[in-house]
């Protein structure tokens, strides 16, 4: 009889984490333990699955290594989503991405080592590359110079995972995502715009000049990448860019939201400058040939992903889920 797979998901109540929990419960007979401090997480994101006997929820902090280690016992696969989600906050709190980023990854890896857990998936991002401009950047780019503490923390976490995988016979998969959007977002440009316009529908403050352009990816497209990458990995450590091959500007996102909210004559108040916030990378493109060679493909382009996510967030707003 085949053993039931047991997943341990840090940050499993957050935006991407909750969707991963839901897809695992919906498509497998596996058991899932969510380990989350619920600083931004939401139980309602699980829907009816909240009562599924295969789902266990532990409200605790990944910084608590003894408790984390005890909770992880008996699991075989870790998804590590727990991290600081407010990239701009580091300008006022410079250590946030260490304590809520790199340090968390260290603790997860230590808990895995102590418990003999051998498989980890980690969500990284384009911030590891730094300023790369409009040329699509491949995974083996030689000049990775992050300009934000968020990007530095993600890169440090990647190298820690690589080291633990090689030293302690683990297998690690890192996904460097484009900007992820979808239902139940807890942060991001579109999320911020919707909340600002709900409070002040006649004017929208837009950080920067609105010409920042980036690739966006629907959350369900990245979940399909996880499903594919779970099936087989011979290397101790591997990493992939996962995103759309096109892009969309901040002003275009604002236009989509204004239209879908049915607003008229909204004044855009640009704060000026190329960056939306300190250490923002205003333009980047990802080379996604490596992940596409596995057979993965995104269903939605950047614009479609943003449009779908805006519709879902407006539905959440209508139903009182966002305050």
Task: Annotate each predicted stretch with a short phrase.
Residues 70-71, 111, 196, 225, ...:
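CheY-like receiver
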Residues 19, 44-45, 70, 92, ...:
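Generic recognition of short, well-ordered alpha-helical segments
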Residues 60, 199-323:
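C-terminal substrate-binding subdomain of Rossmann-fold SDR/epimerase-dehydratase oxidoreductases
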Residues 1-180:
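N-terminal Rossmann-like NAD(P)+-binding domain of SDR-like oxidoreductases, especially those catalyzing
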Residues 156, 160, 164, 193, ...:
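Hydrophobic alpha-helix immediately C-terminal to the catalytic Tyr-X-X-X-Lys motif of short-chain
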Residues 135-136, 187-196:
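A glycine/serine/threonine-rich, flexible loop-to-helix segment
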Residues 50, 82, 112, 197-201, ...:
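Hydrophobic aliphatic residues
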Residues 66-69, 88, 95, 106, ...:
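Residues in well-ordered alpha-helical elements
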């Amino acid at each position: 009889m085949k053993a039931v797979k047991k997943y341990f998901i840090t940050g499993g109540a957050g935006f991407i984490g909750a969707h991963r929990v839901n897809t695992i419960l919906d498509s497998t007979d596996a058991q899932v333990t969510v380990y989350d401090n619920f600083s931004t997480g939401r139980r309602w994101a699980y829907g009816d699955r909240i009562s599924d006997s295969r789902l266990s929820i532990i409200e605790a902090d990944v910084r608590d290594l003894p408790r984390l280690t005890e909770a992880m016992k008996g699991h075989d696969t870790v998804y590590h989503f727990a991290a600081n989600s407010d990239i701009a906050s580091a300008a006022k709190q410079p250590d946030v991405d260490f304590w809520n980023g790199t340090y968390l990854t260290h603790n997860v890896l230590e808990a895995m080592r102590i418990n003999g857990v051998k498989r980890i998936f980690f969500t990284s991002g384009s911030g590891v590359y730094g300023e790369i401009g409009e040329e699509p950047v491949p995974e083996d780019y030689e000049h990775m110079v992050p300009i934000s503490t968020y990007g530095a923390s993600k890169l440090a976490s990647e190298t820690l995972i690589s080291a633990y995988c090689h030293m302690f016979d683990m297998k690690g998969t890192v996904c460097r995502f484009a900007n992820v959007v979808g239902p139940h977002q807890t942060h991001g440009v579109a999320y911020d715009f919707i909340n600002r316009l709900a409070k002040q529908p006649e004017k929208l403050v837009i950080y920067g000049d609105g010409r920042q352009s980036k690739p966006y990816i629907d959350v369900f497209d990245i979940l399909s990448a996880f499903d594919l990458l779970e099936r087989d990995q011979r290397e101790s450590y591997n990493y992939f860019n996962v995103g759309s091959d096109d892009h969309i500007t901040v002003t275009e996102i604002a236009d989509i939201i204004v239209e879908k909210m049915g607003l008229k004559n909204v004044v855009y108040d640009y704060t000026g400058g190329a960056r939306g916030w300190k250490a923002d990378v205003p333009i980047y493109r990802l080379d996604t040939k490596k992940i596409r060679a596995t057979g993965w493909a995104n269903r939605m382009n950047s614009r479609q992903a943003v449009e779908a996510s805006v519709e879902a967030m407006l539905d959440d707003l209508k139903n009182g889920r966002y305050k």
